[in-house]
């Protein structure tokens, strides 16, 4: 009977156990309670971010299905052996932003299918030989932003398929030989470490297939040891992406790029050194005359090794070691000396409520880790004595208040972790004094507002993490003047994000994360779409998916057409983005018209082409303006010259005509009525003098016809003219100028100056007497003789006075040599120089 009862109970227990196990195997594991699960392309995505998970064993997954597991921002502090043995189908595991300080050997056993492992932003200090045991198929390993100082020689020896290794922002001083001998790396990131050199033998020779090598922000010593790296970099194929190696020492090379330095300047011909060590251990006292630093350091080492040889030096050598037993370390923390980085202080998860619990502060701290404590506020006086800090980790605390100026003395700080706290608002005063800060981590807070100018006190900020907050808008010019290269705005509350005055200030951007926001794919998002399309391929890390309107849910923003986002948008073919920029407005900013036009031009035409075109247009305008100015000046000069010529013609004595000797009509002169008593009797008496070859052919024909008609009467006319003029009171025998003398001058024109022979004499007489006295004297002399001999010549005298005292009429006469001879031929007496002088004055 007892036997049957025992069998019954055994079968009952077996059924109960079988019944209890069956739901576990058939259920969806942690997807029903702890985590969020989603299936995509046949792979289960298990999201367990920020669930307060302390142990990996708390996770259960569906059986026989490949999955990706995310354990971001939890409370993991250590990975124990076989922690992942039940996750054999995992192909990707994300353990970032925890406080993992140690990984036991065999922790990754059973993950033979794993291809990606993320252990970034933790507290790892060492990578041991068997740390990654069991990850034979691993292709991607991310271990950046830890405190790794040591990598053991065989740490990566079993990772025969590893292609991407990210180790930036650690404290690695050197890499062991042959560390990558069996690793087919194509991408290696070593930025932000303490490396001084990379040898060819044992390191560079094993990464010949590298495509992307990042080496910035290290402590490179540009000396002879770095020549191998320089030569190797120069021989790399042009398609490889190699970061700049910037010298940190010696001082005269600090800030210089290695590739731009000459080999002779980096490593001049090294001098020949003497041997410093003697096999017998004796000291080389003769070497003290040398001033070489390396010799002095070597000599000091030999002294320390031989205390028995110099007993008198023992007190001086041992005294410093007795005075410095070790660095001081606060009681709840662990400290480690990192040469040359300084003192590393580990105070994570020590239930520290305030930094005042660490007093007195240690000397020369470089890195202070306070992650995972219960600090609620940070006051201005808490960090006054930590001015030597280069890294401060305050992540995963309960900080709600950051007093303004709390970091005022941390002028050397380069990395600041404030992730996983309770901050709700950021202002400029919180970050005063952080002049050298390059990395700022503010993810997993409750930040709703960022005031304008918050990041201005950090002129060297490169990396900014603001993901997993509650941000909806960003103030204008929030990134202005900040050289950001990496920005994470993932998992916030952005429905749209203006490009103008916000995103367009990110001139040095290389990576931005905008996914997992409730994007409203409407007209307000057209500017963001066009900005994303202009970025390089890998700048935007993940897809930006629309949340609203409903018909665009889960649609990728970059792949949508602008007309779908904004149906009323009309694009101009020549300027495809001008209208969109004019129509898209945001509540946070107002778009300037000039800025809109300039932006539309730069969208349609490359900026370099636009600048070149504007330059050519400017040069063309300058030349046109100069040509117009020259033309105006030339025409003005010609006009002035013409006026001067006309004035000279008006004032020239050659143009004066005396009506008493007849009137002449040239080819430029208009006919006037006769103004002389003798004009009707004067018919060109000197035709042979008047002819000139400068006249036109028509004029010459008229002259020839006239000569043919009057040729026979020329002598008769000349003789009658002379006889008539002899009876004139002006040319009579009683006058000063006799007819015989004038006839001689009139007939001989060999001397061209005969017309003005007496001008100088009469001018002197005029200057002595004056115009009035001169006229009175001459008229008084002429009047009695004329009345005596020619009582009827009174009218001629009045006519002469009228001509002398009145201004002669202007005649448009061209001053030519022919007219000059013609005028001289028509004058039967010397011209009255008084009238000429009066005209000139």
UniProtKB/Swiss-Prot annotation:
Gene3D superfamilies: Ribonuclease Inhibitor. It comes from Homo sapiens. LRR repeats lie at residues 89-110, 113-134, 137-158, 161-182, 184-205, 364-385, 388-409, 412-433, 436-457, 460-481, 483-504. Residues 27-67, 320-361 form the LRRNT domain. The keyword Cell cycle does not apply. One of its GO terms (biological process) is lens development in camera-type eye. Residues 1-26 form the signal peptide. It holds the Pfam family LRR_8. The chain crosses the membrane at residues 609-629. Its main location: membrane. It is linked to Deafness and myopia: An autosomal recessive disorder characterized by prelingual sensorineural hearing loss associated with high myopia. It is a single-pass type I membrane protein. This is SLIT and NTRK-like protein 6. Residues 218-269, 517-568 form the LRRCT domain.
């Amino acid at each position: 009977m007892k036997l049957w009862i025992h069998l019954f109970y055994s079968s009952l227990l077996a059924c109960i156990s079988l019944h209890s196990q069956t739901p576990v195997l058939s259920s969806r594991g942690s997807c029903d309670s702890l985590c969020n699960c989603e299936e995509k392309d046949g792979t289960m995505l298990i999201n367990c971010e920020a669930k307060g998970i302390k142990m990996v064993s708390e996770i259960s997954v569906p059986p026989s299905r490949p999955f990706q597991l995310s354990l971001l921002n939890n409370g993991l502090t250590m990975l124990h052996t076989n922690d992942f043995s039940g996750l054999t189908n995992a192909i990707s595991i994300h353990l970032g932003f925890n406080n993992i300080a140690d990984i036991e050997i065999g922790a990754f056993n059973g993950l033979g299918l794993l291809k990606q492992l993320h252990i970034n932003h933790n507290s790892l200090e060492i990578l041991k030989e068997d740390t990654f045991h069991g990850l034979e198929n691993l292709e991607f390993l991310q271990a950046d932003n830890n405190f790794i100082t040591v990598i053991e020689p065989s740490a990566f020896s079993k990772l025969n398929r590893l292609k991407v290794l990210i180790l930036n922002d650690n404290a690695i001083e050197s890499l062991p030989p042959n560390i990558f001998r069996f690793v087919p790396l194509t991408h290696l990131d070593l930025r932000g470490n303490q490396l001084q050199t990379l040898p060819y033998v044992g390191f560079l020779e094993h990464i010949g297939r590298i495509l992307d090598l990042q080496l910035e922000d290290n402590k490179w010593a540009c000396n002879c040891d770095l020549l191998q790296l320089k030569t190797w970099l120069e021989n790399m194929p042009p398609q490889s992406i190699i970061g700049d190696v910037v010298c940190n020492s010696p001082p005269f090379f600090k800030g210089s790029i290695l590739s731009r330095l000459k080999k002779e300047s980096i490593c001049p011909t090294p001098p020949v050194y003497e041997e410093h060590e003697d096999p017998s251990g004796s000291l080389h006292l003769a070497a003290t005359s040398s001033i070489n630093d390396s010799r002095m350091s070597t000599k000091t080492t030999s002294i320390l090794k031989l205390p028995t040889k110099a007993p008198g030096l023992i007190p001086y050598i041992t005294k410093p070691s007795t005075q410095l037993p070790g660095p001081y370390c606060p009681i709840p923390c662990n400290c480690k000396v990192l040469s040359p980085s300084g003192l590393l202080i580990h105070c994570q998860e020590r239930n520290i409520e305030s930094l005042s619990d660490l007093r007195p502060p240690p000397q020369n701290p470089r890195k202070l880790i306070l992650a995972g404590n219960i600090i609620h506020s940070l006051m201005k006086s808490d960090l006054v004595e930590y001015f030597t800090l280069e890294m401060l980790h305050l992540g995963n605390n309960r900080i709600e208040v950051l007093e303004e100026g709390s970091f005022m003395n941390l002028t050397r700080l380069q990395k600041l972790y404030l992730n996983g706290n309770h901050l709700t608002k950021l202002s400029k005063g919180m970050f005063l004094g952080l002049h050298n800060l390059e990395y700022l981590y503010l993810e997993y807070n409750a930040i709703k507002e960022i005031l304008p100018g918050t990041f201005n006190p950090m002129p060297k900020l490169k990396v900014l993490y603001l993901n997993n907050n509650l941000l909806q808008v960003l103030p204008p010019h929030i990134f202005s003047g900040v050289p950001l290269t990496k920005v994470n705005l993932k998992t916030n509350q952005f429905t749209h994000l203006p490009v103008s005055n916000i995103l367009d200030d990110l001139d040095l951007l290389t990576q931005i994360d905008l996914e997992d926001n409730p994007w409203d794919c409407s007209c307000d998002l057209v500017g963001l779409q066009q900005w994303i399309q202009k970025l390089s391929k890998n700048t935007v890390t993940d897809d930006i998916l629309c949340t609203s309107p409903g018909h665009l849910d889960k649609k990728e923003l970059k792949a949508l057409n602008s007309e779908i986002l904004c149906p009323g948008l009309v694009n101009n073919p020549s300027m495809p983005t001008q209208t969109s920029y004019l129509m898209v407005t945001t509540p946070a900013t107002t778009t300037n018209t000039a800025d809109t036009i300039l932006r539309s031009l730069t969208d349609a035409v490359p900026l370099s082409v636009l600048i070149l075109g504007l330059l050519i247009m400017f040069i063309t305008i300058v030349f046109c303006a100069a040509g117009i100015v020259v033309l105006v000046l030339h025409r003005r000069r010609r006009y002035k010259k013409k006026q001067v010529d006309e004035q000279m013609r008006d004032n020239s004595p050659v143009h004066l005509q005396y009506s008493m000797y007849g009137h002449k009509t040239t080819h430029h002169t208009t006919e006037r009525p006769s103004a002389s008593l003798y004009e009707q009797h004067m018919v060109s008496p000197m035709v042979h003098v008047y002819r000139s070859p400068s006249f036109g052919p028509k004029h010459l024909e008229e002259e020839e016809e006239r000569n043919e008609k009057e040729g026979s009467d020329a002598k008769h006319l000349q003789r009658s003219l002379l006889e008539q003029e002899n009876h004139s009171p002006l040319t009579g025998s009683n006058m000063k100028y006799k007819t015989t003398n004038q006839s001689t001058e009139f007939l001989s024109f060999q001397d061209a100056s005969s017309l003005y022979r007496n001008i100088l004499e009469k001018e002197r007489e005029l200057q002595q007497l004056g115009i009035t006295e001169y006229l009175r004297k001459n008229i008084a002399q002429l009047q009695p003789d004329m009345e005596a001999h020619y009582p009827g010549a009174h009218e001629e005298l009045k006519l002469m006075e009228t001509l002398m005292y009145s201004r002669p009429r202007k005649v448009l006469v061209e001053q030519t040599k022919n007219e000059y001879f013609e005028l001289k031929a028509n004058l039967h007496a010397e011209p009255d120089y008084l009238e000429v002088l009066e005209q000139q004055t």
